[in-house]
Regions:
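Sec-dependent signal peptide recognition
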Residues: 2-10
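Hydrophobic h-region of N-terminal signal peptides that target proteins for export
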Residues: 10-19
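Structural preference for beta-rich elements and adjacent junctions enriched in aromatics
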Residues: 19-230
């Protein structure tokens, strides 16, 4: 009886440790396929109605693990040729910092999508667009402890500012990245930086002492589709 009780306690403890170690195990979006391309113009086309989406974002800074001060919606779709990402960022128009900036400058209000395309939980691509439509990209290395800013992909991104906030659209061709064709899911995270109050907002939750970690990304699940373009 004691041995059985001990086994149960060990199993419960292990489950609690796993849950504590990665709060993002249940975070997942389905990558649904559409047949027509989306025009990258910062306007919300009807095709986005078919996309899986999330509003479940968390504040990392300045107030760790507190509710975000603004609402963010992220959506994702695919065609045979490319992944499409839409981010709807609600805000007071007068508080949006739309700095023109330079490529790879990461300036002003900016949103990002990060993709672990090999499922190794150590490397990922990062694609970012600021509120004025300037794009930036990089490779995340060593579980996001290091960055390779020299990497430049061939992809599209733009933004549009509205009275209620701004919209970012991205198109990432599969031929512009490397990936494991055998995988049915990739690692995924979204990020939003709000310059006005220096607020860093993530889809996934991280430990304050560590910061963002690829090993704790959520999932992007390929729904009846796997990319084959190289």
């Amino acid at each position: 009886m004691k041995q059985r009780l001990l086994i149960i306690l060990v199993l419960i403890s292990s489950s609690l440790l796993l849950a504590t170690g990665n709060k993002n195990l249940e975070k997942a979006l389905r990558l649904l396929k559409i047949n027509s391309e989306i025009i990258i113009d910062g306007k919300i086309d009807s095709a986005w109605n078919y996309a899986d989406s999330t509003t479940n974002f968390f504040q990392f800074e300045p107030y760790f693990n507190q509710p975000t001060s603004v609402k963010t919606i992220a959506k994702i779709l695919t065609t045979e040729e490319a992944i499409y990402c839409l981010m709807i960022c609600y805000d007071d128009k007068n508080l949006i910092q739309a700095n023109a900036g330079m490529h790879d400058g990461y300036t002003g209000d900016i949103v990002s999508i990060m993709l672990d395309t090999f499922g190794d939980k150590q490397t990922a691509y990062k694609f970012a667009v600021n509120a004025s439509g300037v794009i930036s990209d990089s490779r995340m290395l060593d579980d996001a402890r290091n960055r390779d800013y020299s990497w430049d992909g061939i992809w599209q991104g733009t933004s549009q500012i509205y009275d209620w906030g701004f919209v970012v659209e991205m198109k990432i061709p599969y031929k512009s990245i490397k990936y494991d064709k055998n995988l049915s899911e990739w690692g995924l995270d979204f990020d939003r930086w709000r310059s006005y109050n220096k607020e860093d907002i993530y889809w996934c939750e991280y430990e304050q002492s560590e910061g963002q970690r690829i090993s704790k990304f959520g999932k992007l699940i390929f729904q009846d589709f796997k990319p084959t373009v190289t």
